[in-house]
Amino acid sequence: MRKNRAPKRTVLPDPVFNNTLVTRIINVIMEDGKKGLAQRILYGAFDLIEQRTKEKPLTVFERAVGNVMPRLELRVRRIAGSNYQVPTEVPQDRKIALALRWIAMFARKRHEKTMLEKIANEIIDASNNTGAAIKKKDDTHKMAEANKAFAHMRW
């Protein structure tokens, strides 16, 4: 067993926007260690966002992440041989991680031609409180609400 928990690694801000949140989404988009490609995709998507919304892409992106962040999630807890889905509050760093993961995941599932367009459209949709990532957050909250009776089993 481990002696203690591995320390959280600090994320360096990205070179263009000087923002750690942008670096984190780049790391989520990245596949097979191709960070340069992930950066090209995201910065291209940001250019597209700027063209379509006439707003700063960073503000649109931050609004999108804020809209997708879940407040509650379900954790499975085994008590007396049965599994209960217990709603628990989500810590701030996990909220951000889930939001970024959901945005990237649902962007990949979209039907636009390029990944650049998929990411741009998913971010725009999320900033307008629509899209699949927002639906995922709402479904998570609905499930938590439905299992509210087990909230006293938190640990």
From Swiss-Prot:
Q: Which GO terms describe its cellular component?
A: small ribosomal subunit
**CDD domains named in the record:** uS7_Bacteria
Keyword field contains Transmembrane: no
Q: Which residues cross the membrane?
A: none
PANTHER family, per the entry: RIBOSOMAL PROTEIN S7 (PTHR11205)
Subunit annotation: Part of the 30S ribosomal subunit. Contacts proteins S9 and S11.
Would you tell me the protein name for this molecule? Small ribosomal subunit protein uS7
Lineage of producing organism:
Bacteria, Bacillati, Mycoplasmatota, Mycoplasmoidales, Mycoplasmoidaceae
